[in-house]
Amino acid sequence: MNLSPREKDKLLVSMAAMVARRRLERGVKLNHPEAIALISDFIVEGARDGRSVAELMQAGAEVLTRAQCMDGIAEMIHDIQVEATFPDGTKLVTVHQPIR
C-alpha cells in the first residue's frame, strides 16, 4: 500500500485520536498532541459527513473541556487549523480557543 505524505499524516492523526478516545474512556486526561489529534479528527470526519465549515468551527470548540485535559493544555492551544475534504473540495477550518 503506497500512501502519499498527506495520507500518512491523516492516518497518524486518526490513530492518535483513537488513542485519545480510549484514554478519555478510562478517565485519563489528555496531553497536547492527543487534544489536537482528537479535535482535528472530529473536523476531518465532520467534513466527510457533509457538515459545513461554520458548523465545524463551532462544534470543534465543544469536543473537549478543560476538565478532560492536563493542566495548562487549554492555554497552550489558541487555534487549531485543519485542512479537510468537503463534498465541494478542500477547505481550511479554523477553531479558535478549542478547549473551553
From Swiss-Prot:
It catalyses: urea + 2 H2O + H(+) = hydrogencarbonate + 2 NH4(+). InterPro entries: Urease_gamma (IPR012010), Urease_gamma/gamma-beta_su (IPR002026), Urease_gamma_sf (IPR036463), Urease_subunit (IPR050069). Keywords: Cytoplasm, Hydrolase. Disulfide bonds: none annotated. Pathway: Nitrogen metabolism; urea degradation; CO(2) and NH(3) from urea (urease route): step 1/1. SUPFAM superfamilies: Urease, gamma-subunit. It is found in: Cytoplasm. Belongs to the urease gamma subunit family. Heterotrimer of UreA (gamma), UreB (beta) and UreC (alpha) subunits. Three heterotrimers associate to form the active enzyme. This is Urease subunit gamma.
